[in-house]
Swiss-Prot record:
This is Small ribosomal subunit protein bS20. Binds directly to 16S ribosomal RNA. It comes from Prochlorococcus marinus (strain NATL2A). Keywords: Ribonucleoprotein, Ribosomal protein, RNA-binding, rRNA-binding. GO terms for cellular component: small ribosomal subunit. Disulfide bonds: none annotated. The keyword rRNA-binding applies. It comes from the Bacteria. Belongs to the bacterial ribosomal protein bS20 family. PANTHER family: 30S RIBOSOMAL PROTEIN S20 (PTHR33398), SMALL RIBOSOMAL SUBUNIT PROTEIN BS20C (PTHR33398:SF1). InterPro entries: Ribosomal_bS20 (IPR002583), Ribosomal_bS20_sf (IPR036510).
Length: 98
C-alpha cells in the first residue's frame, strides 16, 4: 500500500498506462490477423478489389506497428519482427497469384 500521495498517483498513472498499452497491443494483433485473413481472401479470389483491400489493410497494420514502437508500447525488434512476418505473407501471396 502506498503511503505518500505521489506514490498513490504513480500507481494510478501506471494502471492507466498499462490499460492504454494493452489496448494498443490488442489493436496491433487484430490488424495483423486481418492482414492474414486478407491474404487468404486474395489467394482464393485474386482481383483488383481484393488486392486494394489487401494493400489498405497492410498499410494500416504497418502504420499502427510503427506508432506502437514510437510510443514505446512495443520494442523496436518486436515491431520489426511483426512487420517482417506481414511482409513475408504478402510476398508469398503475391508471388503465388502472379
Amino acid at each position: 500500500m502506498a503511503n505518500t500521495n505521489s506514490a498513490k498517483k504513480r500507481i494510478q498513472i501506471a494502471e492507466r498506462n498499462r490499460l492504454e498499452n494493452k489496448n494498443y497491443k490488442s489493436t496491433v494483433r487484430t490488424l495483423m490477423k486481418r492482414c492474414f485473413v486478407a491474404c487468404g481472401i486474395f489467394e482464393k479470389e485474386p482481383g483488383d478489389e481484393s488486392k486494394a483491400d489487401l494493400q489498405k489493410t497492410f498499410n494500416l497494420a504497418f502504420s499502427k506497428i510503427d506508432k506502437a514502437v514510437k510510443k514505446g508500447v512495443l520494442h523496436k525488434n518486436t515491431g520489426a519482427n511483426q512487420k517482417s512476418r506481414l511482409s513475408v505473407a504478402l510476398k508469398k501471396v503475391l508471388k503465388e497469384v502472379v
